Amino acid sequence: MAQKSHSLSHTKWHCKYHIVFTPKYRRKVIYNQYRSSLGEIFRRLCSYKGVEIIEGHLMPDHVHMLVSIPLRISVSSFMGYLKGKSALMMFDKHANLKYKFGNRHFWAEGYYVSTVGLNEATIKKYIQD
């Protein structure tokens, strides 16, 4: 299996991350119109930053993503951007969320991240199931 590497002028990299994060209070709100909105928002925000979504799954109470993040962006700054902007965009698109979550706090603090090496196929299967 050939690994796809990314490159800059003097650098080559192959960095993939498995990321999991939850809505505030781990509420089961990621369904129907919220689910489709979040998928669209995540794809748009990732394309703005040059982040490739390899695999992703929106569960009712958490999100799994397998992503390739460029070296110029740290994982923590990307997650701050992704969670912050997606929350603002969700509250703009679905104004009724403010009654469940308060003022513009859609995601819980923190997230889980793990680097992905040779076990990429295993993690893809885990995310899909």
Regions from the PLM with identified roles:
Residues 1-129:
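Basic nucleic-acid-binding interfaces
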